[in-house]
Amino acid sequence: ATTEVIALLRLKPVFVEVDPKTFCIDADEIEKAITEKTKAIIPVHLYGQSAEMEAIMEIARKHNLFVIEDNAQAIGCDYTFSNGVRQKTGTIGHIGCTSFFPSKNLGGYGDGGALFTNDEELARRIKMIVNHGQKERYYHEIVGCNSRLDTLQAAILDIKLKKLDDYIAARKKAADYYNTAFAGNKKINTPYTAPYTDHVFHQYTLILEDVNRSGLNKYLAEHQVPSMIYYPVPAHRQNMFASFGGGDYHLPVTDRLSERVISLPIH
């Protein structure tokens, strides 16, 4: 989803290696991928914890780039800057994007999402784009689309938003239970939380060591324990991005993780 919109806008997505512990974009690798054509950095706060936003924002300022946070899996997550200031993910970059798909930590009854920004001009344009480009009804200033949040979804989310902290606390409690149960098991690496970030556990994702993942997946299914692979094929290896030079990337950490991760139920 993160890269689809880039391609739909006829822009070129450029993939960067991830941190082997957090699964988020490796800030140390970003500058190597920047060219004179680069317009924005899009960090994805994967599985429920933040990318290294302080370093990313410094790189963006240095190269005069926008930062668009994909916060779909980390709503409610706290990022701590080196000066001790804490800020919610999705509010650090120029724009923050989140999803209200039912499986998300703050999910609606169907599809939906939201954008966050402190930039009044960006907010003005976004409000027009999501409403057919209208500045006022029937007066279209720019090309837009119908991306308004349905009233039903808004009503449900209005109630659930008040309970978001409780939902996150329950997920953390479940993660602690898993961590205790798996302690000492050398074939399982439990989720790592970087010192600069909170973890809201949208997914509880393990890294397996010398384990037959498909066999484990089958065994769990036979015992009525759902498990999922997020994600079996990394974005740079998807056929849809072949025309963008996807096959030219050398991202060994990403490839290795995609072969070894498995996610267990958490809610």
Regions found by a protein language model. Give the residues of each.
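Histidine-centered beta-alpha loop that forms part of the nucleotide-sugar donor binding/catalytic region
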Residues: 11, 18, 72-73, 101, ...
